């Protein structure tokens, strides 16, 4: 995988240097217990095991969970702030370079995968790029600070809301690279005002709902994501936009869309393209990215 290789080549040197520094511990600045957890995992016969470094830097979701089970939590406290600072430093070095700033764009993430409402633009020359959330918080698992599949390009609102939520112990949030809302999770409006359904009033509340056949694990993660990231609150800021969508749904019937397709056959490939044009969005799951 090209992206994996590029990511590993970019960060491995700084990671290897830090591991050597931690092992030497010349100034005795690291907490012995935490230091030994790092050394015991990464070193074999007094040498760094590169396969384990590769696993930490480019391993997938399941691989990272395995690493966490072996190394465990390295809590940041006054006795071992230095170890966390070292991992924080190599992470900051990554985000301060063009490779790190453009990583989200390179892997094709243009909209925050947590809320799916905020664009995350990457224009390094103008000082604009996404923030990176650590799905497994670096405050507890600092050795995953530069793990490719632990870095979630996201918007500042979601990054701040999630903060140091421990997604390993309580499995609280959807993992954006592998899990999704899809067609099984949807938004619904709640209102006593009938005009809302015609898009003529925005006096309603937006709620996240799930189909009856959705697995309980997914349903719980969706509820947790909504609570922790304030998804419903954020979407209720856009009632006016939702009203316009409802009005469009009422006005632009299937018959109307078919008439557009028949009248302008050279403009639209099929009915899906007509509806995408009317709603200014892709309604087909395979095009969501």
Annotate the PLM regions.
Residues 99-108, 142-148:
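Short, flexible, mixed-charge glycine/proline-rich loop motifs
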Residues 102-129, 155-158:
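Short cysteine-rich loop/turn motifs with clustered Cys
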